[in-house]
Amino acid sequence: MRILISNDDGVNAPGLVALHAALADYAECVVIAPDQDKSGASSSLTLDRPLHPHTLANGFISLNGTPTDCVHLGIHGLLENQPDMVVSGINLGANLGDDVLYSGTVAAALEGRFLQRPSFAFSFLSRQPDNLATAAHYARLLVEAHEQLDLPPRTVLNVNIPNLPLEHIRGIQLTRLGHRARAAAPVKVVDPRGRAGYWIAAAGDVEDGGAGTDFHAVIQGYVSITPLQLDRTYQDGFSSLNTWLEGLR
């Protein structure tokens, strides 16, 4: 078993190191990760310049690209031995609800599944690594257990782990994505030369976080697992859209 590990926090992130340590005695693990923080990169590929891999002293491969670049290059030629699966994380910070649209952590897993590898994305509900061992424990547990799972085609598992000691985790729940309210407006700043710039503001508050959602599960102390599909076609909308199109003919 060979596992390609990536993330969006960067090649030196503590979550990446913890994930590698958790899986290293289970499988042959290769790390290819961005050379800097690429949070919010989503599924972007770098098309305007060449990518340059660099092997670090610890054996991790640093790449001047996005998380999706890392997985794409890892499966398409950089590695002599092809990986059997892709594991992304452990992200320091949640990827819940609408976060998955922007997350580089989730995007790395989606790219792995697009390239026909079973894939997981792991995120931890804290920017601090205090209880990171809890997330590493569940990453190992679920990756090992995937051998008993017939993962549906074009589906990845998005996993969020509460910031709690292991003994305080209440279990694992299968969840749907919740929803956030609209994010705050960008924050305008002016540099010393009088030039205006903007910071993207924080994500919106939880708007749909009821029972059954990923938000609800982690707040209640459960690990949340949400199956995500590559196919974003809205099949249920075909009937009304066909009626609309008929009126245009």
UniProtKB/Swiss-Prot annotation:
It comes from the Bacteria. A divalent metal cation binds at residues 8-9, 39, 91. GO terms for molecular function: 3'-nucleotidase activity; 5'-nucleotidase activity; exopolyphosphatase activity; metal ion binding; nucleotide binding. Keywords: Cytoplasm, Hydrolase, Metal-binding, Nucleotide-binding. Its cofactor is a divalent metal cation. Signal peptide: none annotated. GO terms for cellular component: cytoplasm. It is found in: Cytoplasm. This is 5'-nucleotidase SurE. The gene is surE.
